[in-house]
């Protein structure tokens, strides 16, 4: 599908009634499971990719080409739109961000996210003007071929400044971001404030892993148009592995060896080849 058609298709999933639930895959089989379940689009997760490779997230320990190859694999197997969680755009300058957007388009991605993180523990969030210029560069490079998400990580980085978050997301929308995103909003009121401030630009939400998570209908009623999970499905799967290994160490072989049959694994893999 040409980039412009893929863009229109992916954007339509954001603007329809109800919006889009877009889970994140971390390898070929997890992507095929999500496709088989009926999801209409999937995403990469920089944290999950890094973890599968034994590396840390957010420090470019996973290279841009490695991330692109991973995204191409997910798209090739599932034939679904793939959104790339490309951290800060893999570079310090707006030109670096533009180059990453172009590479994502050439790799057939449907969407790409650009964060305002810096990778500097002393100053984890980039200055306002710098952050906006980087999103602007991504939008200009996209040329209507890939959905650009402008993201601020204020909440994740321990900066619970809602006013600054709203200012950043509003500016991202004003320079043309197709979607905006602030992971881990502290509560429903903050989420509604974000949706209201940037309307009609669609808002993505990544909820924090807690017992206070809103349901999909509740998030959609609040005006959210896209729901992603980041690394949460991956960590859910790893929790099951950890539990099984503890059972095995305790002598419980049955608990450690029950799960998806390999016939089912092969069935899913065969679908990826069709």
Which stretches of residues belong to each language-model region?
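Alpha/beta enzyme core
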Residues: 2-205, 209-229, 236
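Extended, intrinsically disordered, low-complexity segments
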Residues: 3, 10, 230-274
């Amino acid at each position: 599908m040409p980039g412009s058609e893929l863009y229109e298709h992916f954007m339509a999933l954001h603007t329809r009634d109800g919006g889009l639930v877009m889970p994140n895959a971390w390898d070929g089989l997890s992507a095929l499971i999500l496709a088989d379940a009926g999801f209409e689009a999937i995403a990469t997760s920089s944290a999950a990719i890094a973890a599968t490779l034994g590396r840390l997230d957010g420090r470019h320990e996973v290279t841009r080409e490695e991330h692109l190859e991973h995204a191409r694999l997910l798209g090739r197997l599932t034939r679904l739109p793939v959104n790339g969680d490309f951290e800060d755009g893999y570079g310090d300058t707006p030109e670096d961000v533009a180059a990453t957007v172009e590479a994502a388009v050439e790799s057939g991605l449907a969407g790409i996210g650009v964060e305002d993180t810096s990778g500097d523990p002393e100053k984890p969030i980039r200055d306002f003007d710098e952050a906006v210029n980087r999103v602007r560069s991504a939008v200009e490079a996209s040329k209507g071929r890939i959905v650009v998400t402008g993201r601020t990580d204020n909440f994740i980085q321990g900066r619970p400044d809602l006013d600054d978050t709203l200012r950043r997301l509003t500016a991202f929308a004003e320079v043309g971001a197709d979607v905006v995103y602030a992971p881990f909003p502290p509560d429903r009121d903050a989420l509604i404030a974000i949706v209201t401030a940037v309307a009609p630009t669609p808002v993505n939400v990544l909820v924090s892993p807690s017992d206070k998570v809103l349901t999909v209908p509740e998030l959609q009623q609040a005006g959210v148009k896209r729901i992603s999970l980041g690394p949460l499905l991956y960590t859910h799967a790893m929790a099951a592995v950890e539990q099984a290994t503890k059972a095995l160490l305790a002598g419980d072989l049955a608990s450690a060896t029950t799960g998806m049959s390999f016939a089912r694994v092969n069935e899913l893999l065969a679908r990826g080849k069709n």
